[in-house]
Regions:
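Terminal and domain-boundary accessory regions
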Residues: 1-208
Length: 208
């Protein structure tokens, strides 16, 4: 990792939420801390966070909760928030709403800053294979692209193949980045510590 590299982070907020919920069973992430883990000691230029606004009329409680979260996200230094909208069809609530405009906004920002040479490394927090074409274009422009992924989602396979570097995100890496603190392990089972080898002494895996 080159400390002189200029880094921009592009976060698909919905993907981050569902990845945290599905893999780590909690969503109270401190976005600023999370991004610091991703950039390591490199130079952060900008964070772009994308999400879709929940309908106030359709889901008032979820809307208020989301607005509180957005307010906290906006406090993160060097972060720009890009908001799309959720589209509710006539089949609601039997059929969940869908996002509109998020992938286009993210792709536009990713490519615009690439062509302007505003970053050396782009870090993409997303699991959608639709970003593969944009990532390849960024690479063709001479920049590197890292993709932060949770677990081994099937949808992430194309991203793994095109990315210059894959950042495997798990609970160990996110230690210290939870707003509600660390959760205690199940006390019914004793703690086990692996043998202290050189690799076990490293807090982060080689990709980070």
């Amino acid at each position: 990792v080159d400390k002189l590299d200029r880094v921009m982070i592009f976060i698909d907020g919905s993907n981050l939420y569902h990845s945290l919920k599905g893999n780590l069973h909690r969503t109270d992430i401190d976005i600023g801390c999370f991004c610091q883990k991703l950039i390591e000691k490199r130079r952060l230029i900008r964070i772009y966070y994308y999400n879709a606004i929940v309908g106030l009329k359709q889901e008032p409680e979820r809307y208020r909760s989301q607005q509180q979260f957005f307010n906290s996200v906006q406090q993160v230094p060097y972060l720009e928030m890009r908001l799309g909208r959720l589209v509710y069809t006539n089949a609601w609530p039997g059929t969940p709403p869908y996002e509109k405009g998020i992938d286009i906004m993210l792709t536009t920002d990713l490519l615009t800053h690439s062509f302007k040479q505003n970053y050396d490394v782009a870090i993409l927090v997303a699991g959608d294979g639709d970003y593969v074409g944009a990532i390849q274009q960024v690479k063709n422009n001479g920049q590197n692209v890292e993709v932060a992924l949770f677990g081994r989602e099937n949808t992430s396979k194309p991203l793994r193949e095109v990315a210059d570097r894959v950042l495997e995100i798990d609970g160990r890496i996110l230690r210290g980045c939870w707003k509600q603190g660390e959760r205690e392990p199940n006390r019914l089972f004793p703690r086990r510590r692996p043998p202290r080898t050189h690799q076990n002494e490293i807090n982060l895996p080689p990709v980070l």
